[in-house]
Amino acid sequence: VQNHHVAEIKGGTFNTTGSAQYVVDNEGHNGAANDLGQMTISGGTLNGKIYVVGAGASLAVTGGTFSDPSALLYLSGNANVKIRLNGDATCNGFKTQSGQSVELDLNNHVLTLAKPTVGSAGTETNSCQLLKGSTVTMKNGTLASDNDKIMIQNYCNLTLDAMTVRGLNALYVLSNNCGNILINN
């Protein structure tokens, strides 16, 4: 789905095949009436990379199932989102807000959280910050980061199921400040 104006995806299945690079290509370059790049995704299954470019582009993800973990960078409102990797992947640090629910199924792959890191203003030192009132499940794979501070800063109800959390340089791979953590293997 390439969008230069206004688009909303509420359902359906979208796959990249052949030479297609992106399942979502959302562009808003100059603020002109025909180049807004405003997109909302509230449902559907999207298998492929997400690409958002341009100073005016905005993407709000409130639902759906994605193979690209960068969907986590665009969580909005009371998002209820599933990520299921189809290969090893890298994405920037991400955060969840109160009311959001995320299921991250690594599907026996490695997800590497890269820079930039996230956190509260002035202390953006986390690979992921899971805020109070959100619910997050990570399962079936390896979460990795080269971050030298905190990989997972947790305030939510968090489940780690059949997970390896690898932060060779981290001060902490998991810091729990609020909420309950359930670790299963």
Q: What are the language-model segments listed below?
A:
Residues 1-18, 26-48, 53-65, 77-82, ...:
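Surface-exposed loop/turn motifs in large extracellular/passenger domains
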Residues 17, 69, 113-114:
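Short capping micro-motif at the N-terminus of alpha-helices
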Residues 74:
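Cys/His-rich zinc-coordinating modules
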Residues 83-102, 106-117, 147:
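N-terminal extracellular ligand-recognition/capping segment immediately after the signal peptide
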Residues 119-123:
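An anionic, turn-rich surface loop/hairpin at beta-sheet edges
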